[in-house]
Curated annotation (Swiss-Prot):
The encoding gene: yeeN
Name of the protein: Probable transcriptional regulatory protein YeeN
InterPro entries to which the protein is assigned, alphabetical: Integrase-like_N, TACO1_YebC-like_2nd/3rd_dom, TACO1_YebC_N, Transcrip_reg_TACO1-like, Transcrip_reg_TACO1-like_dom3, Transcrip_reg_TACO1_YeeN, YebC-like
Gene Ontology MF terms in the entry: DNA binding
Keyword check for DNA-binding: yes
Organism of provenance: Escherichia coli (strain K12)
Keywords: Cytoplasm, DNA-binding, Transcription, Transcription regulation
A Pfam family: Transcrip_reg
Domain of life according to the entry: Bacteria
GO BP of this protein: regulation of DNA-templated transcription
Annotated compartments: Cytoplasm
GO CC annotation: cytosol
Classification lineage: Bacteria, Pseudomonadati, Pseudomonadota, Gammaproteobacteria, Enterobacterales
HAMAP family associated with the record: Transcrip_reg_TACO1, Transcrip_reg_TACO1_YeeN
Family (UniProt): Belongs to the TACO1 family. YeeN subfamily.
Length: 238
């Protein structure tokens, strides 16, 4: 499945801890999910999943409640999902997933970031075909064979189950992520550090220090944009 999840999550954790924007971005995602269905997570599986992810990211309860209350109060903002793909230096690729109430603003901002930070924005599909949309489940554990048996019995379509640094890391088909979570909960596993849909690069590149500095600036600028929810790339040494 490419580089170890421990390496990916170390970078994600460092970025999450370095910015206060993560709370605001989860607030938008929770609001959007609540607006698209019932504002009750027990009646809205999409909302329930976002809230679970927010809790894993240690988003405070008051941030979650505020977003749901805003949706209940009839907030009139409509958010649209988007995906932008492009290239950095020396074979590096990048995908930015967005959630925005103003598509024109987002397109302009993302294009400007690519242009100013040494990248080139591409057409839809120009990069994403080199990534696999994958369900990722991570929790504390050291027996991947036992976990694989649990998932197999529940007929979950699993790509891989590994043990990394005291964690079980499960990669599923994207359509079976929720089924996998349900199977684990039924087996008594209820504490997860990650339950995400991720775009994982099929192959990776290593950049020189000079190119890495440029690419990191591009990634950081995209992640700092209010409308960008997730950034994926294929650089092994970032």
């Amino acid at each position: 499945m490419g580089r170890k999840w421990a390496n990916i999550v170390a970078k994600k954790t460092a970025k999450d801890g370095a910015t206060s924007k993560i709370y605001a971005k989860f607030g938008v995602e929770i609001y959007a999910a609540a607006k698209q269905g019932e504002p009750d997570p027990e009646l809205n599986t999409s909302l329930k999943f976002v809230i679970e992810r927010a809790k894993q990211a240690q988003v405070p309860k008051h941030v979650i409640d505020k977003a749901i209350d805003k949706a209940k109060g009839g907030g009139d903002e409509t958010f649209v999902q988007g995906r932008y793909e492009g290239f950095g230096p020396n074979g590096s690729m990048i995908i930015a997933e967005t959630l925005t109430s103003n598509v024109n603003r987002t397109i302009a901002n993302v294009r400007t970031i690519f242009n100013k930070k040494g990248g080139n924005i591409g057409a839809a599909g120009s990069v994403s075909y080199m990534f696999d949309n994958t369900g990722v489940i991570v929790f504390k554990g050291t027996d991947p064979d036992h976990i694989f048996e649990i998932l197999l019995e529940a007929e979950v379509d699993v790509r891989d189950v590994t043990e990394e640094e005291g964690n079980i890391v499960i990669y599923t088909e994207p359509t079976d992520l929720h089924k996998g979570i349900a199977a684990l909960k039924a087996a008594g596993i209820t504490e997860f550090s990650t339950t995400e849909l991720e775009m994982i690069a099929q192959s990776e590149v290593e950049l020189s220090p000079e190119d890495l500095e440029i690419f990191e600036g591009l990634v950081d600028a995209l992640e700092d944009d209010d409308d960008v929810q997730k950034v994926y790339h294929n650089v092994a040494n970032l």
